[in-house]
């Protein structure tokens, strides 16, 4: 199995984005960030601590592990269980599974007088055979959790993250599927062995099913059209501070803000500080404003 996977990747096709484009992973990103990205403004240069690099690679390895497990089950499930495996990866004409480099594509969108592409790849497009023989195409999105074992508990994780749902909506349009599974895999553990009943409260994997309708896709595409209009017209949209931590264009944004926009951000941060939102959200908003103020004063950040 591993040798076959390595052979596939050794001959993986090269697919490059057709501009203008949006990535499914940016479906919920700050519109101001996407504006500066489209203009080709420089990304922030940040020093990533070694531990962040390790965490990122662990997240990638988790996705690879799940995909390998699914391929292994395709091959051996029936022999071990005594009935056909109900699911398998959809295959390309050359026999490669429909995931990662073998599913990467540019999907053209013409909407609202604008033309752009959705560019990227998915964690998998599966074929699920129901008990009555119906074949359903189901998308798969794998997400890792690493901060604590409780992140995938039934108490903490009651529904999938909204940004992950929107990412799947973009994939639904790209691959023509209306069913999706978001699988959360937790790399943290409370202990090597659990007391009876403890694991059931905080399992290391959680799966959520989505049924994606045309209206969900229309809402997302309309958002991309709005952002593309702002890019073409040179009129950037407001900053969304909710995703500031992972915003790659903080400096460009800070420098492009008008005085009125800066004042609006100050007011927003002030209101958030007085609200009853999580302390982590308050810190993120306050940190964003502090960064912006320093950049505009010419101070090193």
Q: What residue ranges belong to the model's regions?
A:
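Mg2+/Mn2+-dependent nuclease catalytic core
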Residues: 95-229
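Generic structural signal for alpha-helix starts
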Residues: 23, 49, 161, 270, ...
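Intrinsically disordered, low-complexity segments enriched in small/polar residues
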Residues: 6-7, 19, 33, 169, ...
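Metal-dependent nuclease catalytic regions and adjoining charged, substrate-binding loops involved
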Residues: 177-301
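Short linear functional motifs in flexible/disordered or boundary regions
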Residues: 42, 74, 78, 151-152, ...
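Metal-dependent nuclease catalytic cores that hydrolyze phosphodiester bonds in DNA/RNA
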Residues: 1-139, 146, 282-301
């Amino acid at each position: 199995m591993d040798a076959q996977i390595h052979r596939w990747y050794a001959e993986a096709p090269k697919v490059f984005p057709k501009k203008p484009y949006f990535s499914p992973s940016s479906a919920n990103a700050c519109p101001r960030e996407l504006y500066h990205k489209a203009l080709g403004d420089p990304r922030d240069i940040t020093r990533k601590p070694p531990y962040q690099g390790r965490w990122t690679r662990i997240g990638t390895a988790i996705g690879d592990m799940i995909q390998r497990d699914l391929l292994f089950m395709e091959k051996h499930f029936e022999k071990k269980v005594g009935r056909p495996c109900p699911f398998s990866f959809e295959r390309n004409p050359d026999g490669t599974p429909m995931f990662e480099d073998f599913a990467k594509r540019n999907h053209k969108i013409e909407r609202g007088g604008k033309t752009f592409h959705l560019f990227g790849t998915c964690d998998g497009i599966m074929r699920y055979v129901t008990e009555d023989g119906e074949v359903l195409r189901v998308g798969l999105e794998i997400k890792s959790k690493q901060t604590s074992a409780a992140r995938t508990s039934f108490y903490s994780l009651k529904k999938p993250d909204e940004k992950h749902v929107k990412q799947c909506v973009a994939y639904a349009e790209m691959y023509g599927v209306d069913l999706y599974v978001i699988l959360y895999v937790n790399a943290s553990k409370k202990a090597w062995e659990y007391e009876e009943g403890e694991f059931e409260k905080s399992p290391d994997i959680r799966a959520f099913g989505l049924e994606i309708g045309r209206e969900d896709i229309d809402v997302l595409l309309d958002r991309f059209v709005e952002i593309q209009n702002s890019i073409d017209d040179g009129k950037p949209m407001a900053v969304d501070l909710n995703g500031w931590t992972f915003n790659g264009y903080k400096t460009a944004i800070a420098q492009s803000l008008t005085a009125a926009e800066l004042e609006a951000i100050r007011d927003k941060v002030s209101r958030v500080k007085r609200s009853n939102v999580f302390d982590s959200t308050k810190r993120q908003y306050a940190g964003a404003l502090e960064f912006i103020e320093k950049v505009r004063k010419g101070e090193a950040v």
